[in-house]
Every structure is written in C-alpha cells, then in structure tokens.
Amino acid sequence: MNYATIKWADVANGPGVRVSLFVSGCTHHCPGCFNEEAWDFGYGDLFTPEVEDKILEALAPSYLKGLSLLGGEPFEPANQAVLLPFLRRVKERYPDKEIWCYSGYTLDGELWQDSRARCEHTDEMLSLIDVLVDGRFVEELKDLNLRFRGSANQRIIDVPSSLKAHQVVEWKGEHTIQPIQK
C-alpha cells in the first residue's frame, strides 16, 4: 500500500489534535474530491514498517487524541490488508486513543453487506475503529459548515455502538457548542 501524505498535527479530521494518514487508492472517483491524486494506488510513498513505527512514536504525546485514516479509500480491499495489522498495533499500544476512518463506502451498505469492499479483513478492521465517517463526497451537498465531513450525506458513526446494536448509531461526541452565558 502507498500513502499520499501524513499530517502529524491535524485538527480538521476528528476532535483534538491527531495524526492523519492519507492512504493511496480509491475507486469512487467522486466529482469535486479534495484529494484526487490519491485515487491512484501507486501515488505517494510506500507504507513501510518504518513509517508505521514513526506514526506510533508520533502518537505518544498525551495531547494527541488519536489517529485518522483518510484517502484515497482505507476500505479498498488492498488497503485493508495492510491497514489491519497496523491498526492492531495502534490499539495494542494506545488503547485509549481514538481511531477515526473516512470512507466512501457506507457501513450498512458495502461494509456490512456483500460488495467488492467487503473482504476477510473488514469485520476486524471495523472492530478497531471508533468513529467512521461514511458515504461518498457529493459535490452538490458540499457544506463548509459541517464539522468533520465534506457533504451533508456523510454520516459520523459510533462504530462500537453500531456493531453492538447491529444498526447504525450516530456519533454523539464532541460536536455540540454551548453558548457563553453573560
């Protein structure tokens, strides 16, 4: 697997400061995609054990809230095969850090049902992810006011609760704003 880039102190792709890994390879080809160059599976650099180790080291500070996976498409089967052992390492070393994943595939669609995205790694990979932002980017539904997603059709999903309930459960985390009382 190749990766397009790594953001070592990202505040846009999940709550708090995070490390964000942008994988290469995506077959969705959404019009208006912000990362079109990452559609190519060969784009960027090889995701090596040394890169994994560097990310694991970068996650050590307590102010880092977690890891975000973006793309490209993390749930392309070829990417799942590489990401799954890496996510195991992340969860083993940092069980309290949140893993967020952005996917054009939907949880209750392609990831839970028979599809080209669902493979022998999908269920375990989902079990290691805390929050999934699912759904393809739809340019006509783009809204810059949305937090942690690009278009209104995309959902922010609490994966552990969804797996337990066998249905999609919306993430109720840190996205409420309290007015200041005078």
Task: Kindly give the residue locations of the regions a language model identified.
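N-terminal [4Fe-4S]-dependent radical SAM core
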Residues: M1-F22, T27, P31, N35-G42, ...
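Conserved Radical SAM active-site core
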Residues: M1-Y3, V17, N35-S115, E120, ...
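Residues at the C-termini of beta-strands that transition into short coil/loop
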Residues: K7, S103, R136, P160
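Short glycine-rich, flexible loops that bind phosphorylated cofactors or substrates
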Residues: E76, E140-L141
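P-loop/Walker A phosphate-binding loop and immediately adjacent motor/lid segment at beta-alpha junctions
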Residues: F86-K91, K142-K182
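Short, conserved loop/helix-junction motifs that constitute active-site signature segments
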Residues: E124-S127, G150
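Receiver (REC) domain switch/active-site residues of two-component response regulators
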Residues: D130
